[in-house]
Amino acid sequence: MTDWISRWETNRIGWHAEQVNRHLVKYLDRFNLTTGETIFVPLCGKTNDMLFLLEQDIKVIGVELSDIAIKQFFSENKLDYALSKVDNFALYESAGIKLYCGDFFDLESNHLENVRAVYDRASLIALNEDLRQKYVKHLSDIIDFDARILLLTLNYPQHQRSGPPFAVSKKEVDQLFNGSFDFQELYCIDDIENEPMFQNLGVDFVEKAVYLLQKVRM
């Protein structure tokens, strides 16, 4: 967690993308959301994907450890916000969006009121193997039954490059979510040709995948 804060303080945020993620645009309808419903974006940073969701009349709840990221999101998008304290979080709130500044693992279900979907572009792959299992367990505990998750992952030979982002295979996704979620692979491709950083490190492949998961009743 200290490293995450440090990266924002020193602007080492190579994972941040200025453009809206094309997979979110393509698969947005898979959430089956209607106007005014709410989506949760864990470890949200200052992603412009949240602005895209707002423009689709979808409400957003996010959680982020760094207040720098949250403040930059609002300032760069010229959005005013109100600041308050809610439990262990500083809550930054504007029209249609609530961003909790604090630890994801401190979130409870009441913080995610009316959330119908989860968008995980770079949360699971930002965590090491030990934390990934804890992350999925906690996420499952705090979201409602039938909530859908759009999950984006990377997979590559982990011994050829240290994370983050960490390698997460389809097998691991199945193991992590097995029993609590139905899941479907929507997309999977080896995209090493478009990853010069991985090429320079001698990585053999970079598999990018998109999954749709739905929490089921036990």
Language-model features and meaning:
Residues 1-35, 46-49, 62-97, 101-111, ...:
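Class I (Rossmann-like) S-adenosyl-L-methionine-dependent methyltransferase catalytic domain
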Residues 54-55:
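Gly/Ala-rich phosphate-binding loop of Rossmann-like dinucleotide-binding domains
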Residues 40-45, 123:
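Class I SAM-dependent methyltransferase "Motif I" SAM/SAH-binding loop
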Residues 126-138:
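A short, conserved alpha-helix within the catalytic core of class I
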Residues 119:
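A conserved beta-strand element that flanks and buttresses the S-adenosyl-L-methionine
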Residues 37, 115-116:
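Conserved acidic residues
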Residues 12, 122-123:
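Short amphipathic alpha-helical interaction patches enriched in hydrophobic/aromatic residues
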